[in-house]
Amino acid sequence: VRKLQVFAGVATVALMAVATSSRAQTASEAAPVALDEIVVTAQKRAENLQDVPVSVTAMTGAQLQNQRVGDVLALSGLAPGLQIKTDDNAANPRMFIRGIGVNDFNPGTASAVGVYVDGVYIASPLAQLAGFYDLEQVEVLRGPQGTLYGRNTTGGAINVVTKKPSSTPGGDIAVEYGRFNAVNAQGGFGGPIAGDDLSFRISGLYDKNDGYTTNRLTGNKGNDANRWALRAALRWKPDDKLTADLSLSLNQSRGGSIWTYNRSILPQTAEATGADGFCKAGFYTSGQCTNALGYANTSGNLYEGDYRFEGKDIVKLFGATANVSYDLGDMTLYSVTSYQRAARDDWEDTDANPLQVISARYIALQETASQEFRLQSNGEGPLRWVTGLYWAKDDLSNDSHYDVLSDLRNPTVDNPTGMDPANSIGVFGWPLTLKSRSWAVFGQFDYDLTERLTFTGGLRYSVDDKSIHYVSDVDYGLVTLFVHDGDKSFKSLSGRLGLRYALSDDANLYATYNRGYKSGGFFTGQTADEADLEPYSDETVDAFEVGAKSEFLDRRLRLNAAAFYYDYKDLQVYTTIQRGLLTVQYFTNASAARVYGAEAEVEARPARGLSLTLGASLLHAEYEDFVSVGEDYSGNRLPSAPKLSFNGAIRYEHPLPVGDFTGQLDFTHRSKVYFDTANTERLSDEARTFVNGQVGWKLDGGRYELGVWGKNLFDETNILDITAIEGLGFDAFSMGPPRTYGVYLRARY
């Protein structure tokens, strides 16, 4: 609350300062400037954001750069209802929109929020944490997108649009240096190769820091970053009808594996024992709480631990995309072709203590090919339509191993390795392959019933064929617990109905119904019970939304608001359960869930040089009917679904005798969240507010800019996730960076 008051105070001061300075300006200089028109492709065609009957937040490349959004994780909180977390340093972000997402970190589980780059669905969670650079825009679509986007978008979608080649020569570069010896350099350049017919753009990223977590055993730093990326793009436009965009991209991350904070939870005294049998709050660092091997972490510093080894999280990505369009006159044919390859090798010290309780190794390779054809109407007649075909092939090879309680091995003549699976002692492995084949046919149309009233209808039929080969073994195949083979076909019909009414040229009302669909499948996590591998069902949602989009004061004030209600059936849920000493993963369907709430976004330009934005979300998200493995979760809140969240920014630019001053202050706030389905209090996090700022100096009409920046200025505790590993006696905290700050230099030509 204090931080929100500070932000409000700064906003008031900024407005007073602008009012004072404007009196010294001429009438022309003081005239407010209208808000920029925002063009989005949420409905697979370029449209004014205010005319699109979908809840969309759009952020330009410049806005992302000013807020230091380096990947999809950094988008968390920047759009109403958007929360993102991870338990890894280089892969597997978990995205939630309006409380809808999947808590599972395994690469075989698709998110409920689809990520798209230049129209291509990024199927692999291994690739969804790739660095952002050289971007034109990012769009966050809230609500099911089952018609035009299809499977795995019951929560929504994130559209990432990269900068395209141009026949006009140009380039830009940005370099930053900050706390933890952080270096970030990114940029791009391009121009014509053969007149206006053929042009290119090459862009890249280098991002490295020493890390913000300390190993007490060695003094070394962890949770570091070391990644680079390169993208080469060509645009061929031989005439006004044909446009072909081709791109190749490489990404590589070789930073350290995640270092979590270990909270000991097994009480060793009656005084420290809580009602649930675990340690009471307030005793975790007292020395009266240990893990399964008796280690007691007595430090409350969430950015340090006793790490036996310092592993690496290596991710290598390759992508090739071809976007081709051909104007046929009354319609345009589009083709989107893509191939993606993602490989990962992650070795992490999961328990964060000097004793060998548990360590993990994750090795994965995922290859995806996809093809989409769309035929869309041109022109501005009363009927506008799009129809298409989609096909995708996805192959995953995954090999996970947990080395559990190796210090308790007792080799004998009869058992030379000392493994004891019955007591969870050994190296437990789960090598698997998962193959998916998907296709869909879809169509959507808009028809103007009158000059002001427009009807929208759409349908999509989807088929997903999946097969799995899964092995559960001990000590790298020395003992095989079971082998499972399964296959199943999932079919679904999703769609959309809507009405949009134009009150005026600057105000629209809309009401929509969407049927969303998330394909069923096979669990690809770690289990010792073959029954857990029975296929889980499709997730479906009936979503109702009403909204208003309006602009006032000669387009100096923009207000968009929406209210929504979701009725979920068979919501896919990831959780953990206890089997012996081992905490194992479990994936199932909740019978029903209910989500409803409201959102609003305000953007204003009250005076020349001053921009204000504010977003708010009020959310109710709970399981209505969910009984699993003997536990009743009905009535519990969904994970990562805060009841209240805000985001906002103030930006001011003002001419100086030499150059221009730029200043920005932005914030995100969310209320309390739970990280598990059981709503366990110790696995929750209180309300958090993060405030960031930037002050800069622009020269030569904005061609050059230098300045200072800070993120998390008040050093708010930055907990991304808390995972209970109760069988081994600890909770693992995944931590985001503390306060960071630095300097930057940008140039363009």
Regions found by a protein language model. Give the residues of each.
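Periplasmic-side early beta-strands and strand-to-turn transitions of outer-membrane beta-barrels
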Residues: 159, 166-168, 176, 188-284, ...
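Membrane-embedded beta-barrel scaffold of Gram-negative outer-membrane proteins
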Residues: 321-328, 332-348, 502, 508-518, ...
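C-terminal beta-signal and adjacent terminal beta-strands/loops
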Residues: 567, 657, 668-676, 697-749
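Gram-negative outer-membrane beta-barrel transporters
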Residues: 378, 384-386, 455, 565-567, ...
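Acidic, small-polar-rich N-terminal luminal/periplasmic segments of exported/outer-membrane proteins
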Residues: 33-168, 546
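N-terminal Sec signal peptide and the immediately downstream disordered periplasmic leader
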Residues: 1-67, 73-79, 240-241, 320, ...
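Outer-membrane beta-barrel translocator/receptor signature
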Residues: 110-112, 124, 133-136, 142, ...
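Outer membrane beta-barrel strand-and-loop segments of large Gram-negative receptors
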Residues: 360-377, 420-422, 428, 434, ...
